[in-house]
């Protein structure tokens, strides 16, 4: 039996997988994202940055799986960042940063990049490695100050890439998107399907499982 592992603490990613019929085993990555970005260098392409972060997260949980006795697994790691004005933005962390970002992106469009990494593990060894990124254009509304302050006060935008969500309160302030909605939420089902195929796993194998594929 091969376990299906999500290398992320994101409730949104878990919800996407569950709504698509998959109940993964969750093992949270402890990757130092700033260190990974610094190692890539200032000239690294934004698409490369999010993809390498996703790869680092997937790889980081492998020792945990070995410790837990999980030697056959499909591991999925993801990382999302918002590209606006040539700059990549992750989680704002504070109300002031989130407010400044909304001031810059209100009424405009930006690109949400999500890196994806799929590792196939058999008998404790990596036997398949597929990775890529998705890019979705997000068109933002211009929320009134009162609505924006109320949104900031919820704390939701502080811990999500780009200071917004599509599937929760932030969805009120997104006019439309061009691309895959699940990628904006944090894990793109179309891309994961393709990457799983590259490592020899079909999505239909996952539907009837609870954290495992035959």
UniProtKB/Swiss-Prot annotation:
Gene Ontology BP annotations: nucleotide metabolic process
Function, in words: Nucleoside triphosphate pyrophosphatase. May have a dual role in cell division arrest and in preventing the incorporation of modified nucleotides into cellular nucleic acids.
Coiled-coil zones: none
GO cellular component, one term: cytoplasm
Annotated active site: 79 (proton acceptor)
Listed transmembrane segments: none
Catalytic activity: a ribonucleoside 5'-triphosphate + H2O = a ribonucleoside 5'-phosphate + diphosphate + H(+); a 2'-deoxyribonucleoside 5'-triphosphate + H2O = a 2'-deoxyribonucleoside 5'-phosphate + diphosphate + H(+)
Enzyme class label: hydrolase
Protein name per the record: Nucleoside triphosphate pyrophosphatase
Keyword field contains Chaperone: no
